[in-house]
Amino acid sequence: MAGNELLNSNRRRGSNVTNYFLIILFLFGCIQCVVNIQQDSFGDHHQEKHIEAFQRKHFLKSHLKDTKRKKSDASLENNDRNEEEFEEELDVHDILEDERENKDDNDDKEETLVGLNCKPHGGPMNELAKEMVYWEDIPIDNKFISPLQKEGKKQYLTFESDHGGWNNIRMAMETVMTMAVAMGRTLVLPPEQHMYLLDKGSSQRSYFSFAHFFEMDLISQEHTALEVISMDEFLKLEGLSGNLRDIKTGEIVFPPNNRTNYDGADHRTISKKLEAYLQQVGLVPPWDPEKCMMAFPTTADPADIKVLQELNNSAASVKMPTYENFIDKPYPVDASPFDRMKENWAGRSGLCIYDKEWQDAQLIHFAEGYDAKGARLLVHFYAFLFFEDWQQDTWMKRFVRDHIRYVDEIQCAAARIIAALRERVQSYGNDSGKYNAFHIRRGDFQYTVTRYDALHIIKNSAKEMTPKGTVYIATDEKDQSFFDPFRKVYDVVFLDDFKDLLKGVNTNYYGMIDSLVAARSEVFFGCWFSTFTGYINRLRGYHNNKEKGEGYEMGYHNSYYYALDDRKDHLHHFYPVKKSFYAREFPTSWRLIDKGIEEFQHLAINKE
């Protein structure tokens, strides 16, 4: 009996060992399968990366083949050399980088305000895209908070989009955003809507918010000074909760029909419903940029407000100098408040001071100046805002330069075209890859005095342009025969010549891409009165300041006007801001704005 029990016990033990062994074999097999799958996946992923790198390498060559141009022997030798260098760059910047262990594929999809990553947007390589970057990464700047921001009290700024073309809309938006930052208020973006001339195509987005052009979320995340929310969020948070009151009666007023989402609504609905409501519950400033400068005290202390009031009184008691007094004679950027005020006075009648009444308002609303009670903000932010503290002034100019820039999709599309342009120039034997550019404004432009014929424009610019050189023309002229005289003296290209590099890009972005391509030209000719030309010139100022190019200390750069005749070389002189502000951009927006960063610590208040 005992022997049988021992035998049975041994059998059970043997059976258990066998079971354990089978389980171990099964688990080992599962692990091996998983490893094989991962290796196959990595191999496929690795191969895809190589294919992607190969496509990036060859997209410029494919584009050049379409031009069907003959190349000289010297050009071919140069191209062979460039191709070898291109392959070396690919090895370093693409293939080896793609093979790094533990690299998260989602990293390529992350947008950032620092630098420019074109991988998620169809190229070009970052090595080629880096020339687009005029903005700087200044961590200490990101910590600055307006001393006018009220502790523990949420305040807002709302505004109505300008009804003009894109660059008028952008200009007004920049002004409003900088005011929100200066006031320490949350900026409320208007709803997504149709914008003038940005409504092309029924199969693509044709109504927009500013977040479709600028990295609003990233700006708000990176910058302690600015909070940005949508109109829908604002109306739900403050309107439906009964926190908004009629400015005149003090009674609680809810949004019309309790509606909060106006995205995609027509202009009439937005105007009659939403904007009328905001004008009812918000304090609407009567400030007119043509008549006054929007002045901000250093702090909310009544003593600082008094300083601005005394400055205003001083200006009223003397004859203020005209802009001619400051041509090529700017004050230092750290000059006294009164000197800086004189330089930017521009024949206005006084200061509009952000005093206690405005500082205490829960909501300030800027109404568009056509039918509303506010003034149209057709003015550059730096021509309207005045800061008692010069360091706050240069900080604000850096804020715009370093943060309010086009989204990566637009930047990268322009970078692809610029790379193709430079390789085109090199293929003709010019190793520098430099091209020149025009912005020729015609179309619906109301300033007919600038409507010169082609021969007049060629004659005005001949001295500065390179004979037979490559010229990029940004234009709204639809009649291609207008440019036949240009083709006789230059290798002329347009945005349409690079459509193969813009597949999948919303055509409503083409104007912005045009401006970025023109901004990187060696010599640029634009049109007086055009805000499109103006923005190109500001971008060129940013680039020249970063590169420490010739004349950067005075704000000069290698740009001209083909119209008007008497203003051709205005950008080779320092001009202070003057009316009409929108007609051009001024060097005060980019000149020496990095001065004083090292002493900025006392203003950088980190409230995180």
Segments the model singles out, each with a brief description of its role:
Residues 1-15, 47-56:
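Short, low-complexity, Lys/Arg-enriched N-terminal segments of secretory-pathway carbohydrate enzymes
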Residues 15, 21-32, 40-48, 54, ...:
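Secretory-pathway glycan-assembly enzymes, especially type II membrane glycosyltransferases
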Residues 174, 194, 509-561:
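A donor-sugar binding/catalytic signature common to diverse glycosyltransferases
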Residues 203-207, 479-491:
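Short, aromatic/basic amphipathic alpha-helical patches
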Residues 445-474:
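Conserved catalytic-core segment of nucleotide-activated headgroup transferases in glycan assembly
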Residues 490-521:
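Donor nucleotide-activated moiety binding/catalytic core segment of transferases
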